[in-house]
């Protein structure tokens, strides 16, 4: 009787593990593309428009990324943070 209970418990555990693993895969966060993925796109040997020449350097992508969003992590003044779900302090 004890061995049967153990095998049922083990089976239920592995079944739950498989089901929960599927849920975890659907709840993941999409991250930004890395410069290595972008580098692969630009290094294609075929060009859509052969008259246009595109040069790509990894340093250029990193510099654009820094300059593109300079105010992303700007602190707010004390007392002026709207909080979650509020666009202003008049609620």
Swiss-Prot record:
Q: Single GO molecular-function term?
A: hormone activity
Entry superkingdom: Eukaryota
GO biological process, any: response to osmotic stress
Keywords assigned by UniProt? Answer: Apoplast, Developmental protein, Hormone, Hydroxylation, Secreted, Signal
Region: Disordered, residue numbers = 69-91
PTM per Swiss-Prot/TrEMBL: The mature small signaling peptide is generated by proteolytic processing of the longer precursor.
Induction data: Induced by auxin and nitrogen (N). Induced in shoots in response to nitrogen and nitrate starvation. Also accumulates under osmotic stress (e.g. mannitol and NaCl).
- This protein's record includes keyword Ribosomal protein: no
Q: What does the record say about tissue specificity?
A: Mainly expressed in the lateral root primordia. Also present in the shoot apical meristem (SAM). Detected in the primary root apical meristem, at the root-hypocotyl junction, roots, leaves (in the small dentations at the leaf margin), siliques and flowers.
Q: What residues does the annotated propeptide cover?
A: 29-71, 87-91
Q: Which residues carry this modification: Hydroxyproline?
A: 75, 78, 82
Q: Which GO terms describe its cellular component?
A: apoplast; extracellular space
Cleaved signal peptide residues: 1-28
Q: How does it assemble?
A: Interacts with the CEP receptors CEPR1 and CEPR2.
Q: Which family does it belong to?
A: Belongs to the C-terminally encoded plant signaling peptide (CEP) family.
* Function of the molecule: Extracellular signaling peptide that represses, in a dose-dependent manner, primary root growth rate and lateral root elongation by inhibiting both cell division in meristems and cell growth in elongation zones. Also slightly prevents growth of above-ground parts. Regulates systemic nitrogen (N)-demand signaling. Mediates systemic up-regulation of genes involved in N uptake and assimilation pathways (e.g. NRT1.1, NRT2.1 and NRT3.1).
Q: What is this protein called?
A: Precursor of CEP1
Per the UniProt record, the source organism is Arabidopsis thaliana
